[in-house]
Amino acid sequence: MDQELKSSGKCYFCVEVLSQKEIGKHLATHLIAMEKAAIGKKTKSYHHILVEASEMFLHILVDSNAKMKIIDNFLRNIWLECCGHLSNFGHKNFKISMSHSIAEVFVPKVKIYHDYDYGSTTRVELKTVKSYLLPLREPLVLLSRNQPLNLMCATCKKQPAVCLCSVCLYEEFAFFCSECALLHEETCPDFEDYANMPVVNSPRMGVCGYEGGSIDKARDGVYKK
C-alpha cells in the first residue's frame, strides 16, 4: 500500500476528534472525572478496553461482571458478521471461554485476541486500559471508533475509494472510485462477476461476503474529503 493512512477517533463525551495515539489518554481524562464525581453514589466496576486491527480501533467500556460473549456479539455487529462463522477469544498461555467474566480475563499488561471465521480469519487484539467505578447502567458503551480511513482511488488518486477488487487486492492497492471501477471491470472479469466489494470501516473489509456492520453505520462508510 503506497498511501499513508491517517487514523483518528471521535470522543464519546465531547466529540473532539483526536489521533489514534491521543484518543486513549483523552478518554481517560473524562472517565477519571466521571469516577471522581460519582464518589458517594451507587457505582459498579467497568473496564476500558482497547480493540485494534492496524489503523482500525475501538475503545469500549464494559461492565466488569459481564461475560466475554457481550464483546463477541459487539465485535460481530460492528466489525465482523457476514455468514454466521464461528469465533473465539484466545491467549498463548491460557484458554478463554465466552462465559468468563470481563474481570477474569482483562488484567493489566495482558493482551488477548479474537478470531472470527476459521477459514478466512479476521483477527483483532484486545487489552484493558484501566478499570473504573462508574454510575452507569449500560453493559457496554462505545467510547470511540476510528473515523473512515482516507482510502483514495488507486487509479485517479483524487477521489475517495468506494469499492475494492477482492481478487486484485492481494497483489496491488485495488481500491477504486465509482468512475475508475468501471475501467477496472474492463481488465478484470472477476471484478464484474463477484469481486466488487464495498469499502467499509472494518478489518473484515474485502473478506468473504462482508459488506458492513449492523450498528454505528454513520462511521461505517466511505472517507469524505
Predicted regions and their residues:
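Short linear regulatory motifs enriched in tryptophan with gly/pro/ser
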Residues: 1-225
